[in-house]
């Protein structure tokens, strides 16, 4: 990773630029199915963490970009209750309370595929449900609506991802946390079990913390 951030004969990249460079590498590796043996996609997720280790004090813009990249990668490491998607059907990601992340995710996923499926980003507003979603990202701005949105995602068989101190407590499967100014994520296997979701062991190996389930 240091070779990427500071190649011989070039000036070292600034923290935000370093993260953007790492994102290009991480996103270049297409997400793979959970049961496949190819490790390149997960190496891309590891690259996000490694880049943040290099880039001290990343800006809010870089934080947003890293979260969007993780959301994109998560899709390839989850078995959903409905089974594999039909040919031509897209993965649908809902975003509530985080317009900036929605815009960044739409930009990053444009023209990219997950398991040969396109990714559609849907901005959720008050009163919108989670039906038809595969992943629901609930931004911190949702506040008191967080628990209700997590419950809606669970009922729809969608992966819930939050970014608050109460995310896991509210029932979210994945929750973003900042550790030493770096974006990491924690996982609740119990919440995944309640939502009938199966998470790849490779995804769990990159998590900052994993809360075990009942099984």
Predicted feature descriptions by range:
Residues 2-215:
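Short hydrophobic alpha-helices and adjacent helix-cap/hinge residues
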